[in-house]
């Protein structure tokens, strides 16, 4: 088993997103886990390790949060892991809110 090198643990999520190699972000997917430092995008779309990616998360308030990141790994026909690049204080605050909300959903009794 490989060692998990994350410094921030991801929480499970279900966030609609769009992504692509430019800000036009033509492909869609679902963020299924997220932390302040990165996320996993579930998609059948292709991504290459090291590729710069534009990502937009659909926030609960009904607006897009545009981010940029670098692909850490790709799992064919499953999705890719992304680390966020140079996020602003405002973007970090919004990501922290998303992570907190996802953590609360996880903790609810089934």
Where are these regions (language model features)?
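Short alpha-helical linear motifs
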Residues: 55-57, 92-95, 108
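Short strand-loop-strand
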Residues: 13-49, 54, 79-81
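Short, charged beta-turn/beta-strand-edge "cap" motif at the junction between a beta-strand
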Residues: 58-63
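Alpha-helical membrane-embedding segments
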Residues: 39, 70, 106-109
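C-terminal structural segments of small proteins and small subunits
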Residues: 74-102
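PAS and PAS-like sensory/regulatory domains
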Residues: 65-67
């Amino acid at each position: 088993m490989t060692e998990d090198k994350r410094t921030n643990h991801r929480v499970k999520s279900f966030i609609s997103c769009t992504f692509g190699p430019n800000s036009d972000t033509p492909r869609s997917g679902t963020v299924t886990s997220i932390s302040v430092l990165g996320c996993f995008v579930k998609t059948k779309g292709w991504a290459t390790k090291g590729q710069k990616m534009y990502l937009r998360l659909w926030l609960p308030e009904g607006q897009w949060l545009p981010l940029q990141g670098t692909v850490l790994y790709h799992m064919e026909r499953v999705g890719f892991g992304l680390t966020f690049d140079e996020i602003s204080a405002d973007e970090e605050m919004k990501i922290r809110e998303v992570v907190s909300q996802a953590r609360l959903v996880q903790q609810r009794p089934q």
